[in-house]
């Protein structure tokens, strides 16, 4: 919350230490993290409402593995707050990777059907890329965007986007 207040102050050209920013106001676009798998969406909505009041202008979710969870989060939390959502898509590299995440990452909820799908795949990484691409396509109908988490496999992001039908624009 303090960081959101600080960004809002910078956007007003204010510096709590020295007064005014010497180069004028910034134009930072602050967001807030949200966990769509949270058990208490009403509590989450209250926390995110305070973050919005502090200056959050969008939400970026933790990894979400099921479209119905994202849809419920958007309908019950994000949409009533008027905050756009970037849905978190995580590249699962293998069944072992998915099981590990379920075991050690708080709030992670990778369905057993996806673990089995990865386990039965002849090429688990290719299957993980397909799963991520399916999620991107699905989530873009529910949220305003996605953010991809491809830990130690960032070079696979173009492949995910290509399979999802998203054209890359050269920079």
Predicted regions mapped to residue ranges:
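Active-site pocket-lining/capping segments in soluble small-molecule metabolic enzymes
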Residues: 1-23, 33-38, 78-131, 135, ...
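Active-site glycine-rich loop that binds ribose-phosphate moieties when present
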Residues: 15-19, 39-54
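Catalytic cores of alpha/beta
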Residues: 42-48, 71-75, 95-99, 138-139, ...
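Conserved, mostly hydrophobic/aromatic
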Residues: 51, 55, 87, 146
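Structural motif
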Residues: 54, 80, 141-142
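Catalytic beta/alpha-barrel core
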Residues: 57-66, 147-150
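Substrate-binding cleft of secreted/luminal carbohydrate-active enzymes
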Residues: 133-140, 145-149, 154
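C-terminal/domain-terminus segments
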Residues: 148-171
């Amino acid at each position: 919350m303090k960081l959101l207040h600080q960004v809002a102050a910078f956007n007003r050209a204010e510096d709590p230490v020295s007064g005014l920013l010497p180069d004028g106001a910034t134009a930072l676009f602050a967001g807030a993290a949200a966990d769509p798998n949270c058990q208490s969406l009403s509590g989450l909505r209250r926390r995110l409402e305070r973050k919005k009041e502090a200056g959050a202008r969008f939400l970026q979710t933790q990894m979400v593995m099921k479209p119905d969870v994202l849809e419920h989060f958007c309908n019950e939390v994000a949409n009533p707050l008027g905050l756009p959502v970037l849905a978190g898509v995580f590249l699962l590299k293998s069944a072992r990777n998915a099981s590990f995440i379920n075991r050690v990452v708080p709030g992670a909820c990778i369905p057993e059907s996806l673990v089995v799908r990865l386990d039965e795949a002849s090429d688990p990484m290719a299957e993980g890329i397909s799963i991520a691409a399916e999620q991107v396509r699905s989530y873009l109908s529910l949220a305003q965007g996605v953010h991809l988490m491809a830990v130690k496999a960032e070079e696979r992001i173009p492949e995910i986007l290509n399979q999802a039908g998203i054209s890359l624009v050269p920079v």
